[in-house]
């Protein structure tokens, strides 16, 4: 049996409540479900989740801030499990195995933190990545990184405000265009240090 199409949304350890709250809106959950997402995992960091009542009821969040439930857009009828055409939705504050979480995902929506981005881009085969810079940060370095990676064709970029517009091409078209990020060449660093120190 093939595993369910899984979308990971991650903000690392930062606060990005506008993104995490947005992807957990009933309208956005229904959109994802209509686009074929069968499992949504939202890693939301230190933020306080602001959820609408029907989503809060579905997720049954525990004292650690983790929760799981099944979302369905069946005219408000609740479902017991994903076999009834529901989308599994899981929320977690943090994970001890981010690489493993990425490895189990078919696509990732991420804040533009360099650690999160590089973890996704270094996976082979490439995993489609939609980067949402947190423009509320003072120096807006996330936008610079996201724009540079977009220009080189490694990621798609969206804002929280245009996420609905971008998510369909991201899930339907981008997977065939995702390309592998170049492997880190550790010997280059050694060569630069040797050259600076005058070693031959």
UniProtKB/Swiss-Prot annotation:
A GO-annotated cellular component: endoplasmic reticulum
InterPro entries given in the database record: Alg13-like (IPR039042), Glyco_trans_28_C (IPR007235)
Pfam families per the UniProt record, alphabetical: Glyco_tran_28_C (PF04101)
Domain of life where this protein originates: Eukaryota
Coiled coil: none
Keywords (A to Z) from UniProt: Endoplasmic reticulum, Glycosyltransferase, Transferase
Localization (cell): Endoplasmic reticulum
One GO BP: dolichol-linked oligosaccharide biosynthetic process
Principal location: endoplasmic reticulum
Segments passing through the bilayer: none
Enzyme Commission number(s): 2.4.1.141
Catalytic activity: an N-acetyl-alpha-D-glucosaminyl-diphospho-di-trans,poly-cis-dolichol + UDP-N-acetyl-alpha-D-glucosamine = an N,N'-diacetylchitobiosyl-diphospho-di-trans,poly-cis-dolichol + UDP + H(+)
PANTHER family xref list: GLYCOSYL TRANSFERASE-RELATED, N-ACETYLGLUCOSAMINYLDIPHOSPHODOLICHOL N-ACETYLGLUCOSAMINYLTRANSFERASE
Known role: Involved in protein N-glycosylation. Essential for the second step of the dolichol-linked oligosaccharide pathway.
Family membership: Belongs to the glycosyltransferase 28 family.
Quaternary structure note: Heterodimer with ALG14 to form a functional enzyme.
Protein name: UDP-N-acetylglucosamine transferase subunit ALG13
Organism field: Cryptococcus neoformans var. neoformans serotype D (strain JEC21 / ATCC MYA-565)
């Amino acid at each position: 049996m093939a595993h369910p199409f899984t979308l990971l949304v991650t903000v690392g350890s930062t606060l990005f409540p506008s993104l995490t709250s947005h992807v957990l809106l009933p309208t956005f959950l229904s959109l994802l479900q209509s686009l074929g997402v069968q499992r949504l995992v939202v890693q939301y960091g230190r933020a306080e989740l602001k959820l609408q009542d029907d989503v809060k009821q579905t997720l049954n969040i525990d004292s650690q801030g983790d929760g799981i439930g099944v979302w369905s857009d069946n005219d408000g009828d609740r479902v017991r499990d994903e076999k009834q055409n529901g989308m599994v939705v899981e929320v977690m504050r943090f994970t001890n195995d981010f690489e493993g979480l990425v490895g189990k995902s078919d696509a990732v929506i991420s804040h533009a933190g360099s650690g999160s981005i590089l973890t996704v881009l270094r996976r082979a085969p490439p995993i489609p990545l939609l980067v949402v810079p947190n423009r509320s940060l003072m120096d807006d370095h996330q936008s610079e990184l996201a724009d540079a990676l977009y220009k080189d064709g490694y990621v798609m970029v969206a804002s929280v405000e245009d996420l609905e517009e971008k998510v369909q091409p991201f899930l339907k078209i981008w997977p065939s265009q995702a390309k592998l990020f170049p492997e880190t060449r550790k010997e280059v660093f050694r060569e630069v240090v040797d050259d600076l120190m005058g070693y031959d």
